[in-house]
Amino acid sequence: MSKPLNWYLTRHPLLYQIRFRLVSKKTSLKAIEDFCYNDINKKNNISTLFFEINNLIFTETNNKLNDFEKATTIAIWLKNNIKGGAGLGKSSTIALQKMMNGEGGVCSDFSQIYSNFCVINDIKVKEWGMKNLSNDPTVSGGHSFNEIYCTKFQKWIMIDVAKSIYLYHKNKDIPISTLEYMHLKKEKKEIAIASINANGSVINNNAYNIFLLSNSLPFVITNYDNKMYDYFLDKLDFFPVSIVHGILILIGKGYFFEFPKE
């Protein structure tokens, strides 16, 4: 039996391959280090729902937190209050609504809404994707996570909200950045995974498989204008999300997957 048209428009592997090739490029380490999601996406372009939820995350006692503490507080709250589920592929506002209602949310959904919470809390942030090559079908494919800039450590650090983890090297007090992670993995040096939660939540084995065992190729997602994407995803919601993304790519308004070039 032939597959329905909707499958070909949303899940056909060839469409993913074409899109991946169109948006992928190699970029210098300095350009990747300098990129920041906040440069494109400003506070006043983030929907009011994020500010409303932000008031639930932070109380008056949180006012004096540093950027690392704020970033951790947001990540813990989201993980504790969103059970996750199927991928959403909606505008950031609709995605947040659905996630809060227990209607889904995968790693890319967590990364997207986390980026917006970072913006409204003056935390510099990036969204990363990762192409994973593995014989394990639960690992092979893709994954999303974030990076935040911590003035406390004077560096970017990886944070995976969906998995609720930081990554470390020998110094267990300072998380590593994505570029450090790539270098350490290439050199086959020690990388440790630790829970964001102070209570030491059990780390899912899938996190070890994704970050330590698979052949991973991280890329930073750039040129993502959240306000513009939200507008088109809402206005063209009768189209499959892959078609909406494809339209924006073809008119030169799409995002890029930028792979570090050493």
Task: Please place each PLM-identified region on the residue numbering.
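Intrinsically disordered, low-structural-confidence terminal and linker regions
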Residues: 1-18
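Short His-Asn-centered micro-motif
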Residues: 103-107, 128-130
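Alpha-helical and coiled-coil interaction segments, frequently adjacent to or embedded
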Residues: 176-262
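Charged, often glycine-rich, active-site loop that binds/positions anionic groups
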Residues: 96-104, 140-147
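Secondary-structure boundary elements
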Residues: 17-102
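Hydrophobic/aromatic-rich core segments of domains that either
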Residues: 112-189
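Alpha-helical transition-metal enzyme core signature, strongest for iron centers
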Residues: 78, 107, 111-114
